[in-house]
Amino acid sequence: MPQHTELVVLLDDDGETIGTAPKATVHTRDTALHLAFSCHVFDAEGRILVTRRAIGKLTWPGVWTNSFCGHPAPDEDMLEAVHRRAEQELGLTLESVELVLPDFRYRATDAAGVVENEICPVFRAVAATPVDPRPEEVGEYQWVDPEQLIPAVAHTPWAFSPWLTLQLPLLYPEHAAHAGLADAAAVPAA
């Protein structure tokens, strides 16, 4: 039985699609700009789900991050991709999915030299079912109050993904400024 190759959408600097490439080939030291997404999932009490990336992940293994991220397949609707990835990574059904940062873009290099270079719209959603993460994706998870997450990220940014440290000041500007995290949003994204 042939193995399925996951493709990502390659973009030019204006965000226009210029092609596709196998996901396994785009996260390198010369990562091409590509399309992704991030999602911040909340529970009924308003707590945010943070996940610790599995140690086996290629990029930023073992660091804490937002609820989940992913890449839409070519010609896949972005909302469908968010729902698909929530189920695949966290065994989670979402409701009230909302686009909150449509133009988020960043470029970052991890300790191994692997580069993330993404136009990465950010979504917010509410969990409709319990979390049941896949261990190859998520090492552990916690539901936390956003007001507690922000100072944790500000004091130990090395323990969190760079995209989360850049997204939080944009999502919670007042809390981030108070915690000293607001300056992270000023870091050039590309």
From Swiss-Prot:
Matches recorded under Gene3D superfamilies: Nucleoside Triphosphate Pyrophosphohydrolase
Principal place of residence: cytoplasm
CDD domains associated with the record: NUDIX_IPP_Isomerase (cd02885)
Functional summary from the UniProt entry: Catalyzes the 1,3-allylic rearrangement of the homoallylic substrate isopentenyl (IPP) to its highly electrophilic allylic isomer, dimethylallyl diphosphate (DMAPP).
EC number(s) stated in the UniProt entry for this protein: 5.3.3.2
Catalytic activity: isopentenyl diphosphate = dimethylallyl diphosphate
Lineage of producing organism: Bacteria, Bacillati, Actinomycetota, Actinomycetes, Micrococcales
Active site: residue positions: C69, E118
Record GO terms (molecular function): isopentenyl-diphosphate delta-isomerase activity; metal ion binding
Record-annotated Nudix hydrolase domain positions: 32-166
Ligand binding (Mn(2+)): H27, H34, H71, E116, E118
Recorded name of the encoding gene: idi
Entry GO terms, CC: cytoplasm
Family that this chain belongs to: Belongs to the IPP isomerase type 1 family.
Protein name: Isopentenyl-diphosphate Delta-isomerase
Family annotation (NCBIfam families): IPP_isom_1, PRK03759.1
Cofactor(s) the protein requires to work: Mg(2+); Mn(2+)
